[in-house]
Structure formats: C-alpha cells, structure tokens
Design a protein with these regions (language model features):
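Structural recognition of the beta-strand scaffold that forms the well-ordered cores
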Residues: 32-33, 38, 67-68, 79, ...
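Solvent-exposed loop/turn segments at secondary-structure junctions
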Residues: 42-44, 73, 84-87, 97-101, ...
C-alpha cells in the first residue's frame, strides 16, 4: 500500500503542531471506510471474520502485527498493538464490526454499497459502528507510519457481536484475552457531534449509560365466553396498568454527567430551549419542563430518570374467548445507580391493581452496572480538547440511554469514553439516522472523525514525533 502521508517531523513540537497532509490521508481513508461498509456483517449471523480479514490484510501491508482470536471461527476479533515506552498503562481504541439487520426492500441506495451521494456516504453501519472502527484502524496505521514515540501502548481491537451477542466479542475478549486488551483508558462508540443548519453545534463524550432491566406485567382474571363480558377481564386490567405506567413521571435524579450535560445545554442553547433546561433544576418549574421534554424530546426526558416503555403485548388466543391472562413486556432502562427492586415497588404502587403483577427479569439481567467514568480526569480533558480543536464547539459529557460494550470494560476499571462522528440533528426524524433504512454519514464527518481520533489518541498516548 502506498504511503499517503506527509509530515513535518519535529520532536520538540506537540502533536497539534504536526503537519499531516490530511487531503492525501483522506483519499485513502475514504477508500478504507467504503470497503468496510461494503462488507456484509449483519448480526445475526454476524460473519465478522470478513471484516477481520480485510483489516488484517491492510495491517499486514503496513507491517502491523495483529492476531485473530475467536470463540466461533466465523465471528472473529482482531487485536493489534503499537508499542509505547510503558511509562503509562495502555490506551484501547476499538470499534465493533457487526451491524444490525436490514430490510433491503426499504433501501433506495443499496445498504452495502458505501455509495457517495450528495456529500453523504450511505450504508448499513456507516454510523454504528464502522465509523469508529475505520477511525481507530486508520489511527493505528498513522501511528505506525509516523514512528510516533508513545508513553503508552495503543491497542486496536475490532470487536464482534456488539449488537446482541457479546459472548463472541467483548465478553469473550475479557474472559479469554484480558491480558491482550487490558488498558487504563478506552475510546469507543456512543458520543458524537450535533450539527444544526449546516454547522457543528456541540459535541458529546459518553461517560456512562443506562442499564437494561426488563420486567413483565402479568394480568389475570376469569376466563369465559366473549359474548358475556366481564369487568375482571385480564386484558382490560393490563390496558389500564399500561396507561398508568406510560403516563407516570418517575422521580428525576441527575448524576455528575447528566447534571453537567443539562447545565451546559442551559448555557449554549437558544433562549427558549436554554430556559427550559435551566427550569429542570428549579423545583417550582421542573415538572412543566419535564412534561415538555416527555412529549417533544424523548431522548432528553429519558436521561432524567429510569424509564419504562411497554413494547410487547400478549393476550388471548381466540376472538370469542375471554383469556385468563394477558402480559406486557417492558423495556426498563435504569439509571446506573438505580435500586431496581425499589423501582419495581414504585411501579406496583403506580399500577395499584392486585390483578396485575410486576414480574422482574428480562433484558440485561447479567449486564454489569459500573460507576460512570469521571469527567475531571486528565484523559477526559485531553479528549475534550481534541473535540474543540477539530470542531470548535462546546463539549458535553453524555449518559447514553442505550447500551454499549463499554459497560463490561468499565466494570473492569477501564476509563471508557464514547466518541462518534458528526451528524445532522434532523437526520433521525428524516429516516437517515442510526439503524434506519437509509443510514448515512456526511463525507465531511468521515474525515473529521479520523482527525478527532488521531488527535485524541496521540494526546492521551503522549505521542512525540
């Protein structure tokens, strides 16, 4: 592979002063990014080994040693290491190689084309998570080419099975290859940069996440003939319980990450929005602000408390038979420090119906619940500075409402920070966002995300040239 990198090398200059010819690097970077997107690694079944084979071929051409490890030969992970002087513990940079499934009939641009159309790259996984995978891969290549002198090893990992099968990915890596990936700090997915009206607005660094703690509502009542309706109908009881839970405003509780997040939004947002975020902190105005967010800004609203969403309902088997039981499956996303049994008790009081039971269990039961990564460390400050250098916008810590594999790493004491590419705020509502049927990323965002990864990695690793 041709070396498409020009440097002004000076050991006395900090990383920010190094003169990388990004125009040349970007050409190569885009080709590698498109190649990753063109690999079908939908999960299930995964087939992440296809991605690993591509990355290994690129690394071999660069003289970067790597090893492939797997629990299943078709679902491999790859680990590579750029050595430092060992004065600090390693930095892990990673991305997951699998993507969620597609419905090909709903895509107007083929989902594995990596096509460049109108300033965007289209394809499944362009945001989640081949953007991070590509940026970490290219950063590893640039570290090797420049011969950077590092204070810590930089470990690159392409990880399988993040989209629901972590026993092939992070779970397997932690249990069987911890010595190969152990690190002080990690850069992975989940943050990003919000763009409004064509301009970057603010950036986020994910430092903690909510935890899946599912439950079921089980309503019971007498069975009988549908021609003789009964007041004790299980479906009627279940419906009333679902309505009460859906309209419930659980207690708001902020942690260091979410408090800082909303305080900063109260400083940088347009006047009306800013006042609403400030109102959240005012006991006299908080309820009205929360109600607005519940209706208009569900992501913000979910960050305020443990959330409950009824997503599956089952009841009855024949139209003329009153069923004796009806159930609803709930997606509960708990705050990191939530006492989930106490929360179930609150739900029971809200429902207030002896015919409806709250049954604990479901998704995320075995998932660790680590404390948030701190937002005052030197590593966080260096990452914050990298975002400011690349995008020139305020940086906010973020609590992810979904789940990532960083939870397992945080549980092992790793300082994990989630980063991500720039995206237009309106893309989600327009059907172009993460997991959508027309997932896309700005070409500019591809290039800037690599620059962000490079600046963050070289700063945290103490690179000297």
């Amino acid at each position: 592979m041709r070396t498409l990198l020009a440097l002004v090398v000076s050991a006395a200059l900090p990383v920010a002063a190094q003169n990388i010819d990004w125009a040349k690097v970007n050409d190569e970077a885009m080709r590698n990014f498109q190649s990753l997107v063109q690999i079908d690694s939908t999960n299930p079944p995964g087939n992440e080994t296809r991605v690993v084979d591509f990355v290994k071929k690129v690394f071999d051409a660069e003289g970067i040693a790597s090893m492939i490890v797997s629990k299943d030969p078709s679902r491999a992970n790859l680990i590579a290491r750029i050595k430092g002087n060992g004065s600090k513990r390693p930095l892990l940079i990673m991305g997951h190689s699998d993507t969620v499934k597609i419905d090909a009939a709903k895509w107007t641009i083929p989902p594995f084309s990596g096509a460049r159309v109108g300033g965007y790259v289209y394809g499944r996984g362009v945001i989640d998570d081949k953007s991070d995978l590509f940026a970490a891969m290219m950063t590893t290549i640039l570290l090797k080419r420049t011969g950077a002198k590092l204070d810590r090893d930089v470990i690159f990992v392409t990880e399988a099975g993040e989209e629901g099968a972590s026993e092939f990915g992070i779970g397997y890596l932690i249990s069987d290859h911890w010595n190969d990936i152990e690190a002080e700090v990690c850069l992975a997915e989940a943050g990003g940069v919000s763009r409004r009206n064509g301009k970057p607005y603010f950036a986020t660094i994910e430092t903690t996440e909510k935890v899946g703690r599912g439950a079921r509502l089980v309503a019971t009542g007498p069975s009988g003939h549908g021609s003789r309706p009964m007041r004790g109908n299980a479906i009627a009881h279940l419906s009333a319980a679902i309505e009460r839970i859906s309209l419930w405003d659980p207690p708001m509780r902020l942690n260091d990450t979410t408090r800082t997040y909303f305080e900063k939004l109260g400083q940088i947002s347009p006047p009306v929005e800013a006042q609403r975020f400030r109102d959240l902190m005012d006991p006299a105005k908080s309820a009205a602000a929360r109600e607005y967010l519940a209706i208009n800004e569900p992501t913000f609203y979910s960050m305020l408390h443990t959330s409950v969403s009824p997503n599956i309902i089952n009841g009855g088997f024949q139209s003329n038979v009153i069923p004796s039981e009806a159930t609803a499956t709930l997606d509960i996303r708990a705050l990191p420090d939530e006492d989930i049994n106490a929360f179930y008790d609150m739900m029971r009081k809200v429902i207030n119906d002896p015919a409806v039971q709250v049954v604990a269990g479901g998704q995320g039961g075995a998932r660790p619940v680590p404390p948030p990564t701190g937002i005052t460390s030197e590593n966080y400050k260096m990452l914050e500075k990298a975002f400011q250098n690349v995008y020139g916008v305020p940086v906010l810590p973020l609590m992810q409402t979904g789940a990532t594999d960083m939870a397992q790493l945080r549980a092992r004491g790793v300082q994990c920070y989630g980063v991500g590419p720039m995206a237009d705020d309106e893309d989600t509502l327009k059907g172009f966002g993460i997991h959508s049927d027309q997932e896309r990323i700005l070409e500019e965002a591809v290039y800037k995300h690599l620059q962000l990864f490079w600046q963050a990695t070289t700063a945290i690793a103490g690179a000297k040239f």
